[in-house]
């Protein structure tokens, strides 16, 4: 799966690279996700986002237009993401709660979510989208 991670710090980059183990084609960018940096998501299927970047309706709409289908958050919460915009765009959203001291575990779970989406599966308990993919197969949405 082609993914992009914005606003990633050097240590997070290292953890993500180790967790990914070259399974997914992940573009890593240290800049924040803004309307000015949105174009880097062109041709990607998934976005990896952290606490620092707010996803408002305009960004979500832009991500959808560029081909993003999945948002994998590694955040303390998801209050920085416009959930109604995500639902309206039909994007899948998963969050792995970011815990200090458990960073490597968090990155492994983010990669596992990418694995599941690449296989057409729901991400289970990490799912934050309003879709009912836990009830019916993901391809029926």
Regions found by a protein language model. Give the residues of each.
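N-terminal glycine-/charge-rich "phosphate-binding" loop or analogous flexible N-terminal tail
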Residues: 1-44, 125-141
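Flexible, glycine-/basic-rich loop-and-beta segments that form/coincide
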Residues: 122
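Phosphate/diphosphate ligand-binding glycine-rich loop within oxidoreductases
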Residues: 46-118
């Amino acid at each position: 799966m082609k993914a992009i991670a914005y606003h990633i710090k050097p240590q997070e980059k290292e953890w993500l690279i180790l967790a990914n183990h070259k399974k997914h084609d992940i573009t890593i960018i240290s800049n924040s996700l803004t309307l000015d940096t949105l174009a880097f998501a062109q041709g990607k299927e998934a976005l990896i986002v952290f606490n620092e970047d707010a996803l408002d309706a305009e960004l979500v709409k832009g991500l959808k237009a560029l081909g993003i289908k999945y948002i994998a958050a590694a955040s303390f919460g998801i209050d920085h993401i416009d959930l109604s915009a995500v639902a309206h765009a039909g994007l899948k959203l998963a969050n792995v709660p970011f815990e200090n001291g458990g960073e490597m575990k968090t990155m492994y779970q983010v990669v596992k979510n990418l694995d599941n989406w690449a296989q057409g599966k729901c991400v289970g308990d990490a799912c934050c989208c309003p879709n009912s993919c836990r009830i019916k197969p993901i391809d029926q949405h």
